[in-house]
């Protein structure tokens, strides 16, 4: 859907997303106008830039409000983001039960991120009764849609025989797909399998990718695992992970 900007330009939400990199303030103003005119995609995007403070003053409470408005208009990712706000206390008190409701609605409508986030709560019993079987089913649904994080977790369930028969070959395939889709945890999981199979050079390549993309929590955990690795080349990467974690902390 397009809308007028300064009367002479017609922009759509995809163009505005691109403008955010080059002219964030101007883009934010146009997004705000479109959101107020009822453009649902713009309402969801407004929530995102308010959450991040891109081109506009950061306001988590207002971000949540716009996510809710867009969700009421049928925007599934906005529904998912409303759940994220509830789960993490962005602009509101933490309410995992409310987060679970939002995720479930998004998941039931087929959104991969909703399926993933709802599965995370089901797997840990946060905001909802613990149900690892349902969590696994949702991870699988999301993975089959191409959700990289869910691919890695599905692989973990299959490798560890969590509420399902052990299927190592299927696990490795999901790790590979997750790694190739760019998930740093999937890259680390796939590297671990490759290293165990003696394919050290391939494992090192994936470990370097995971190092470049991983967040602080992951790097700290991965550093410990690498430090205990049997292969000296793999073990040597532990220091790079430690240094990267220090730089991010």
Language-model features and meaning:
Residues 3-5, 214-249:
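Terminal, low-structured helical/coil segments at or just beyond the last alpha-helical repeat
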Residues 6-37, 41, 45-55:
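Alpha-helical segment of the N-proximal tetratricopeptide repeat
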Residues 12-14, 45-52, 79, 83-88, ...:
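Hydrophobic face of amphipathic alpha-helices that form TPR/SEL1-like repeat modules
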Residues 19-29, 57-66, 93-102, 129-138, ...:
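Structural signature of tandem alpha-helical TPR/SEL1-like repeats
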Residues 23, 37-40, 52-54, 59, ...:
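Short helix-capping/linker turns of helical repeat alpha-solenoids
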Residues 96, 112-193, 199:
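Eukaryotic tandem repeat interaction scaffolds
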